[in-house]
Swiss-Prot record:
NCBIfam families: PRK00881.1, purH. Keywords: Hydrolase, Multifunctional enzyme, Purine biosynthesis, Transferase. This is Bifunctional purine biosynthesis protein PurH. The IMP cyclohydrolase activity resides in the N-terminal region. SMART domains: AICARFT_IMPCHas, MGS. HAMAP family: PurH. Pathway: Purine metabolism; IMP biosynthesis via de novo pathway; 5-formamido-1-(5-phospho-D-ribosyl)imidazole-4-carboxamide from 5-amino-1-(5-phospho-D-ribosyl)imidazole-4-carboxamide (10-formyl THF route): step 1/1; Purine metabolism; IMP biosynthesis via de novo pathway; IMP from 5-formamido-1-(5-phospho-D-ribosyl)imidazole-4-carboxamide: step 1/1.
């Protein structure tokens, strides 16, 4: 009995050669619409789908393969006599191979001119139905959804006249992943359209971006996936201009870097990170000076760090950066001279280019945190804050220079691991206390780090001070200005201590925990 294949694809790459090889192996080919036209034009003889179903394609192509003559031919179990007899009684011919890929829904909704009606018309119904029918019956039917599998299938058919069960099972698994991801994109689109903020089912889909050597530690397996609807301002979408593949820890650090720099738009700024904590932030009227400040903030921790700059990197800045061992540099652009400097004798230095003009769109994406047996979902911590809404709670008002420094410090503290304390002046960070289990411990660490540069500095805390002992430590160090959220039941104790020492203190009303 002649074997039959059904081919209906939107992605026609390689399909003509594939179909020709099938014909050479003695297969009959059923085809539909544009695929049939393409194969006929290439001289590949095909059977029209309506010759199989007995019905014409109708309703602008919405109905063409949803028919018992198709799905009976796909679903009939070859090892079940009752199935084969039912097929014979109803003049249903068996279909042994299905090659289908789906309407380009993802590509359609990514178009800038997309309309709701066009999106709906690009929801494939018949394609997923055929794929699922064939995949369910993979014991007998081979199903192909990816042109990358054409060669494997043809090779096995040529060698043995059929594919192996292992291949059919693998391809079926691929189909179910593919159709699940396809439906997830449709669900995400409709959920967005109706404004559903808390869906009872959460299905998100990602595509494999990079197979990784290992995860956070060598004993951990890891891979990097990119959101199926890509975010332009993301490490997954970054253009890599030089260097080795990014590691798991590189990606985590680089992601933290591009989040931090979003808050520093008004002036040239450089941020240096280690272990997802900013160890140096510098701000100036030009990027070279901003680099100087970021480097001076912590010239020890910068070794092996990640650097992000929010302006084009010029040759002068690159010359200063080049002697230092860095893991990653991220910027919106690089001059030709700067790139030449960076790549000279530094083939492993990872250089990434990102579209900083897409930052705003990246801020609306939800954050997902895995826990054992569950998933936490939250908005990003990107609340808009206006200093005019802040409250000076002490008798002394901040000076103009202190006010500028306090705004800078408040931006910087947002990405320090809690309990987080940062000491800055108006253009650079000077001391960092991160990740301590008590706040006064973080205060002491930050003061110790900044001890030789405390004149004219300010201090920011990511959450309220639970006790006035923090204020006593700060005052003893000579720091004169504090910014914190407030909100402790003992706020008045802290205010009284600040007034006693002549400090100025601002409450922002916004907490910035980071775990």
């Amino acid at each position: 009995m002649t074997k039959r294949a059904l081919i209906s694809v939107s992605d026609k790459s390689g399909i003509v050669d594939f179909a020709k090889e099938l014909k050479n192996l003695g297969w009959d080919i059923i085809s539909t619409g544009g695929t049939k036209v393409a194969l006929d034009d290439a001289g590949v003889e095909t059977i029209a789908i309506d010759d199989v179903t007995g019905f014409p394609e109708m309703m602008d192509g919405r109905v063409k393969t949803l028919h018992p003559n198709i799905h009976g031919g796909l679903l009939a179990r070859r090892d079940a006599d009752s199935h084969l007899q039912a097929a014979k009684d109803n003049n249903i011919e068996l279909i042994d191979l299905v090659v289908v890929n789906l309407y380009p829904f993802k590509e359609t909704i990514l178009r800038p001119d997309i309309t709701y009606d066009l999106a709906v018309e690009n929801i494939d119904i018949g394609g997923p139905s055929m794929l699922r029918s064939a995949a369910k019956n993979h014991a007998s039917v081979t199903v192909v959804v990816d042109p990358a599998d054409y060669a494997t299938v043809l090779g096995e058919l040529a060698d043995a006249g059929q594919t192996t069960f292992e291949t059919r099972q693998r391809l079926a698994a691929k189909v179910f992943r593919h159709t699940a991801a396809y439906d997830a994109l449709i669900a995400e689109y409709f959920t967005t359209q109706v404004g559903e903020a808390r869906p009872e089912k959460l299905t998100i889909t990602y595509d494999l971006k990079q197979a990784m050597r290992y995860g956070e530690n060598p004993q951990q397996d890891a891979d990097f996936y990119q959101k199926a609807l890509p975010t332009d301002y993301s490490i997954a979408s970054a253009k890599q201009l030089n260097g080795k593949e990014l590691s798991f820890n590189n990606i985590r650090d680089a992601d933290a870097a591009i989040r931090i720099i979003r808050d520093f738009k008004d002036r040239p700024t450089v941020v240096v990170l280690k272990h997802m904590n900013p160890c140096g932030i510098g701000q100036a009227d030009d990027i070279e000076t901003a680099w100087d400040y970021a480097y001076e903030a912590d010239p020890v921790s910068i070794f092996g760090g990640i650097v992000v700059l929010n302006r084009e990197v010029d040759a002068a800045t690159a010359k200063k950066m080049h002697p230092i061992f860095l893991e990653i540099i991220i910027a919106p652009s690089y001059s030709e001279e700067a790139l030449a400097i960076f790549t000279n004798k530094k083939k492993n230095l990872r250089i990434l280019e990102l579209p900083f003009d897409a930052q705003a769109a990246s801020e609306v994406e939800a954050e997902y945190t895995g826990v054992v047996g569950g998933l936490l979902v939250q908005n990003q911590d990107v609340v808009a804050e206006n200093p005019s809404d802040w409250q000076v709670v002490t008798d002394r008002q901040p000076t103009e220079q202190e006010a500028t420094a306090l705004e800078f410090a408040w931006k910087a503290i947002k990405y320090v691991k809690s309990n987080g304390i940062i000491i800055t002046n108006d253009h650079m960070t000077l001391g960092l206390g991160a990740g301590q289990t008590n706040r006064v411990g973080s205060v002491k660490i930050a003061i110790e780090q900044a001890k030789d540069h405390l004149d004219g500095t300010v201090l920011a805390s990511d959450a309220f001070f639970p006790f006035a002992d923090n204020i006593e430590e700060i005052a003893a160090a000579g720091i004169k200005a504090i910014i914190q959220p407030g909100g402790s039941v003992r706020d008045q104790d802290s205010i009284d201590a600040a007034n006693k020492h002549g400090l100025t203190m601002i409450f922002t009303g916004v907490r910035h925990f980071r775990h």
